[in-house]
Each structure stands twice: as structure tokens, then as C-alpha cells.
UniProtKB/Swiss-Prot annotation:
It is found in: Mitochondrion. It comes from Danio rerio (Zebrafish). Pfam families: PET117 (PF15786). The keyword Transit peptide applies. This is Protein PET117 homolog, mitochondrial. The lineage of its organism: Eukaryota, Metazoa, Chordata, Craniata, Vertebrata.
Length: 80
């Protein structure tokens, strides 16, 4: 086998191994990004649920405040 043939064969092997390794690394990177996306989605859903709970609590507290304010105004108008 000539020297040129050996060089071409060696370069072909190196390029093939590099391509396979590159594809493997990219697939792993893509899988990791997909997993992170799922985790982010779950965290976002949990924040949304927590925000809805806080909103419902604020609505209830506002109702109680309005009821108490109306009751005090009614008591004040009865005493005058």
C-alpha cells in the first residue's frame, strides 16, 4: 500500500470517527435539552397553580374586607 493510500485511509477513518462522535454528542445534548424543557414546563405549571391560589386568596380577602367595611359603615350609620 502506498503512502498516499495510507494517508487517505487514515484521514477517512479519523473523519468517520469524528462524524460519529459528533452526532452522538449532539444527540445527547438534544436529549438533555428536551429533559430540561419538560422540567421547565413542570415548574411553570407549578408557578401558575401557585399564582392562581394566591389570586383566589386575594379575592377572598377582598370580599371579607368589603363585607367588614360595609358592616362597620352600617353600624356607624345606625349609631348616628
Amino acid at each position: 500500500m502506498s503512502t498516499a493510500s495510507k494517508v487517505v485511509l487514515g484521514l477517512s477513518i479519523v473523519l468517520t470517527i469524528s462524524t460519529v462522535a459528533g452526532v452522538h454528542i449532539k444527540q445527547n445534548w438534544d436529549r438533555q435539552r428536551l429533559r430540561e424543557g419538560v422540567v421547565r414546563d413542570l415548574e411553570r405549571l407549578e408557578r401558575k397553580r401557585e399564582n392562581l391560589r394566591a389570586l383566589e386568596e386575594q379575592i377572598q380577602l377582598t370580599r371579607e374586607l368589603v363585607t367588614e367595611r360595609n358592616r362597620r359603615q352600617a353600624e356607624a350609620s345606625e349609631t348616628h
